[in-house]
Amino acid sequence: MIKAPKPKDSKLWRDSYYHKLFGFKAAIETERVLKFFEKERPNDKRPRNAIIAIKEWAEGKRTLGMNEVRKLSLDAHAAARDAKSEGARYAAHAAGQAVGTWHVPTHALGAFGYAGRAIIAGKR
């Protein structure tokens, strides 16, 4: 296995083009499946708030900080625990992972994985 050097300071990559691209793609993919959550829990805006935050950050319309990202992510995951159907739970988890992309870009992979599960569960 090849070990890639890891930057010790996130300032070297935070807010870079590719970092924002990961966040934007995660937000777009998660938006596609949020319907499963919002159909079941239309008044619960926690996952939607997470998606809005990461998307606005990726578009350069908003700044984010660790405390805000942590709260948005944990709130979205808590919303997932409150949901009854698998599709709704996976969609909310996808939102929690999407906003986590601000902290660690590879959280986008979690967003894509949960979004895929939401699609499959939504077809049942």
For each feature predicted by the language model, list its residue ranges:
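Structured binding/interaction patches within domain cores
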Residues: I2-R124
